[in-house]
Structure formats: C-alpha cells, structure tokens
C-alpha cells in the first residue's frame, strides 16, 4: 500500500510555499488578529458532556481519497445549519483541495451560517497554516502526530494557542499518544483510520482509550456510523465523536444527526 501521508506532505509543502508567496505571513497575521474572536471549541464540547449528552463534531466533507465524491449537492452553509439543528456541538470542515475537494471558503461559509465553533480539518505542516486558519475564522486546528516530529508539533500548537485557538491532537497508536501527551492541548483524537493505509477499525479507539488520562478529552474519529458505534466507544470512556461521511451521505442530514445522537 502506498504511503498516502508522504504523498500528501509533498503537495502540502508546495501549497504552503505558494501561499506564502501570494500572501506574506505579516499580511496573514494582521488578518488573524483582526478576525472575530474564537468560539471556544473545547469549552463547547465540555458543556455538552456536562449535560450528559454526546458531543458531536460534525464534518463537512465533499470527497475523500478512498471514497471519491461523497455528496454532489454540496452546500457548506446548508450542511452547517442542518448539523446545528440536529444537535452537533462543533463543526469540522475539510479545507484540503487535492485529496478532499475542500477549500478555506467552505469553512468561512459554514462558520458564518451557524454559531458553532469550527475546526479547520487539514494537514498542517507549517505555522503559516495556523495563522491562515485563524485569519479565515477557524476556532480550532488539527495536529496529526503521524505527520510531524515533536518540535514541529510543539511550534504549531504554540502558534494556535497564542491565537486563542484550540487544538485537536490526532493519534493512531501508543507511540503517537505518548508524544501527544507531552503537549498542552487537552483534546486527544483517536483516528480509527490508519492514515498510511486508510483501513478503519473501532478497535483502535478501544485499545488506546485506557492509556489516555481521564483529564484529557478523548475524541473518536472515523469509522463511526451508527448509535451502536457511539455506545461501543462510550463503554471505553469516549463520548465525543467526529463523524462526517455517514451523515454527509444522508438526504436529511438533520434527521440523521438526531438519530445518531440518540443514546442507546
């Protein structure tokens, strides 16, 4: 199986270099500082959990490398409103174009359509992307531990925190978890999809959950389709979930979101 993450890093670094030429860091930093203040991503999730509810990070994703086009009638503002009406706590919006047909404009439009905090879902390799995310209104960014060394992860996290943003630290195995726990952000996302093979199993979350300290906020990501999947992960202490594809494919996204969030 080809190493998908390595291929992605190659084109992302080309994208970043091009973006820096088009819009220098100083200009983007000024835009980030002038942007409306971040909506508390982690705080919103904790408030949902404190009420005894599941906390759903609902994903807006047009396509994926493994499945191709997910939704033809793709309208980020409508999807954002549908997720909000269905009970989602936060939004995640794909902004990567080559693999996911995403765009920063999709995130801007989704955030403007709701009051929910928004995660920029992308492959972050450079602090420039963090500042760029805030300049476009992002409330949270993703750090994929498999994609970064410790120094890069620390620098990217520090940039996000300095801008008032939250960070979702994504892991897939014990080694990545141990590295993530050295960082400051409380949210630890366990990706049930192996980013090097794109194979998915909930056993990944079940196996790693016992090693995540209780004061951290565990997030289950990928391979989550039914209320039974949520109940299965809840049994190992995960009550926050990032779900995209299974909801994006439904005709009535609001109804599908409500159905998913019903406690088993």
UniProtKB/Swiss-Prot annotation:
Query: Can you tell which superkingdom this protein's organism belongs to?
Result: Bacteria
State the Pfam families in the record: IGPS
Biological process GO annotation list? L-tryptophan biosynthetic process
SUPFAM superfamilies, per the entry: Ribulose-phoshate binding barrel
- GO MF term (any one): indole-3-glycerol-phosphate synthase activity
State which pathway it belongs to. Answer: Amino-acid biosynthesis; L-tryptophan biosynthesis; L-tryptophan from chorismate: step 4/5
Supply the alphabetized keyword list: Amino-acid biosynthesis, Aromatic amino acid biosynthesis, Decarboxylase, Lyase, Tryptophan biosynthesis
Xref: InterPro entries: Aldolase_TIM (IPR013785), Indole-3-glycerol_P_synth (IPR045186), Indole-3-glycerol_P_synth_dom (IPR013798), Indole-3-GlycerolPSynthase_CS (IPR001468), RibuloseP-bd_barrel (IPR011060)
| Main enzyme class | lyase
Q: What is its EC number?
A: 4.1.1.48
Reactions accelerated catalytically: 1-(2-carboxyphenylamino)-1-deoxy-D-ribulose 5-phosphate + H(+) = (1S,2R)-1-C-(indol-3-yl)glycerol 3-phosphate + CO2 + H2O
Q: Which family does it belong to?
A: Belongs to the TrpC family.
Please report the name of this protein according to its UniProt entry.
Indole-3-glycerol phosphate synthase
State the species of origin: Nitrobacter winogradskyi (strain ATCC 25391 / DSM 10237 / CIP 104748 / NCIMB 11846 / Nb-255)
């Amino acid at each position: 199986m080809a190493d998908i993450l390595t291929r992605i890093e190659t084109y992302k670094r080309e994208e970043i270099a091009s973006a820096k030429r088009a819009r220098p860091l100083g200009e983007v930093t000024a835009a980030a500082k002038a942007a409306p203040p971040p909506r508390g991503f982690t705080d919103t999730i904790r408030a949902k959990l404190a009420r005894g509810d599941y906390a759903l990070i609902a994903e807006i994703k047009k396509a994926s490398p493994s499945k191709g086009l997910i939704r033809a009638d793709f309208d980020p503002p409508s999807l954002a409103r549908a997720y909000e009406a269905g009970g989602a706590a936060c939004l995640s919006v794909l902004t990567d174009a080559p693999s996911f047909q995403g765009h920063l404009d999709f995130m801007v439009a989704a955030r403007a359509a709701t009051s929910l905090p928004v995660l920029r879902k992308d492959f972050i390799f450079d602090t420039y992307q963090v500042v760029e995310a805030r300049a476009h209104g992002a409330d949270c960014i993703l750090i994929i531990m498999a994609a970064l060394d410790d120094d890069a992860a620390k620098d990217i996290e520090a940039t996000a925190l300095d801008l008032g943003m939250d960070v979702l630290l994504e892991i897939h195995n014990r080694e990545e978890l141990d590295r993530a726990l050295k960082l400051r952000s409380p949210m630890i996302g366990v990706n049930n999809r192996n980013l090097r093979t794109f194979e998915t199993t909930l056993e990944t979350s079940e196996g790693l959950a016992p090693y995540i300290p209780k004061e951290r906020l565990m997030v289950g990501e990928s391979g989550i389709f039914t209320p039974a999947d949520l109940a299965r992960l809840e049994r190992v202490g995960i009550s926050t979930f990032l779900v995209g594809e299974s909801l994006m494919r439904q005709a009535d996204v609001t109804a599908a979101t409500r159905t998913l969030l019903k406690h088993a």
